[in-house]
Amino acid sequence: EYDMFKIELSDSHDVRYSYGQEWYDIIKRIWSSNHEFDWDGKYFSLRHVYGNPKPFGGEIPPIMNAGSSDQGQNFAAQNADYLFTVLIDLESGAANVKAIKERAKGYGREIGVFTTSYVVCRPSQKEAEEYHNYYANEEADWPAVDRLMELQGLHAKSFPPEAFTLFRNRFAAGHGVYPLVGDPDHIVDEMTRFYEAGFSGTTVTFVNYTDEFPYFRDEVLPRLEAKGLRSQYCQPDK
């Protein structure tokens, strides 16, 4: 996509985030300004800039940004309402959430933290674990898993053996994110632990959304609502 527009991105994290900061400053100006403006910056030179329609409600929409590097987390702390971060385990996750929130306070801001998870939810714990083992172990495409990890810079030499095995198994099961595997009550218990660790929420993925999400919707979401971890969804009047 960058090549289509003849945009060359630096290999430097600092430069890329500096570029991103200026781009975002322009976007915020477009969203909030009712008049044309010019922009002369380090990366952009623009004339007669104006955007319409504005974001719904006349306010800047909630901003979510993923970042695990120091530069990425600084960018989110300064600009985003929510930061996505990878969860390895809940103990280190809680410490990471605390550090991110403290970082945002340094900029006079508050920020929520999200993670992402893959879900295997079945009526019983045994059913969930058996299916998880079936697709993520017995039928896993290990050469493809190793290639995917390689493309993301994750190599056996980069981690202790136990950590590499953990990541490899999670990539086979759900692109490396945190596992939620079990019956509905177990899934809710795990999500409660997310909340207690300071997370504002998590995205969820499934092997097959069409087949699996209805069960998650009907069995897990009401339990989350009953525990006060999720607001009840009310469909707007047509």
Short names for language-model regions:
Residues 1-10:
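Acidic/polar active-site rim loop that often engages polyanionic ligands
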Residues 9, 13-57, 87-196, 225-238:
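An alpha-helical appendage that flanks or caps ligand/catalytic pockets
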Residues 62-66, 81-86, 111-118, 202-205:
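Hydrophobic faces of well-ordered beta-strands that scaffold small-molecule active sites
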Residues 73-77, 192:
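Alpha-helical segments flanking ligand/cofactor-binding loops in enzyme cores
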Residues 78-79, 197:
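Structural motif
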Residues 87-92, 204-217:
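Glycine-rich, proline-tolerant flexible connector loops at the mouths of alpha/beta enzymes
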